[in-house]
Design a protein with these regions (language model features):
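Class I SAM-dependent methyltransferase Rossmann-like catalytic core
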Residues: 1-46
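C-terminal substrate-binding/active-site "lid" region of AdoMet-derived donor-dependent transferases
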Residues: 123-191
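Conserved SAM-binding motif I beta-strand of class I
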Residues: 70-75
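S-adenosyl-L-methionine
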Residues: 76-105
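A short acidic, Gly/Pro-enriched loop at the edge of an enzyme's catalytic core
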Residues: 102-117
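A generic alpha-to-beta junction signature in SAM-dependent methyltransferases
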Residues: 43, 67, 138-141
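Conserved class I S-adenosyl-L-methionine
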Residues: 45-57
């Protein structure tokens, strides 16, 4: 599925990121409030931050505005990667599995990690659990891990995996910008 997405041409505007072939919206500026709140909980000021999945760059713009010490972005889609670079971001272009390996090998640690990669079906996202299992190797003590969790929290096993680590779970209810259901922002703090 990921390889299919990476081969698709995308259409980028200021407000939307779509697959050209199907016109399917991957990300919309309607998510601005969710991304702003997510960036705020990461507490990026003078921190080393990793975001996996650039999209329109909404969360990364907010992270950058918080003044991180280092700001790492991983983006798999070549067109999105190019757009991120045009916007002045330094991006690790490639699949997260490939980039993360080099971080683990060099024992790179992050104070905050946010994970929001595109998949066709968030409920069965095969990426969340494998990525989440690697987070303890990447996250500094006292660090924060969060993800696009309105749907991700329902992905079988993701929250259970993090709870196995014994990390502190925090949440904040928000009004969802384009859905009548509330959005619960969830993040975890590594306390060991």
């Amino acid at each position: 599925v990921l390889d299919s997405y990476l081969k698709n041409e995308i259409f980028l505007t200021e407000n939307e990121l779509k697959l050209s072939e199907s016109n399917l919206v991957i990300m919309s500026s309607k998510e601005d409030m969710l991304m702003r709140e997510s960036a705020a909980i990461l507490k990026a000021e003078n921190k080393i931050v990793l975001n996996v999945g650039f999209g329109l760059g909404i969360i990364d713009t907010y992270i950058r505005n918080h003044g991180p010490k280092e700001h790492h972005i991983i983006e798999a889609h070549p067109q999105v990667c190019e757009k991120a670079q045009e916007m002045g971001f330094e991006v690790h272009c490639g699949k997260w599995e490939e980039v993360i390996t080099s971080f683990i090998e060099t024992e790179k640690k992050f104070d905050a990690i946010y994970f929001d990669t595109y998949v066709f079906d968030y409920k069965t996202n095969p990426q969340w659990a494998p990525f989440t299992r690697l987070v303890p190797k990447l996250l500094s003590k006292g660090g924060t891990y969060s993800y696009f969790n309105n749907i991700a929290a329902k992905v079988e096993g993701v929250e259970g995996i993090v709870q196995e680590f014994g990390w502190k779970r925090s949440s904040k209810d928000l009004k969802h910008p384009f859905d009548s259901k509330p959005y619960t922002l969830v993040w975890f703090t590594k306390n060991t």
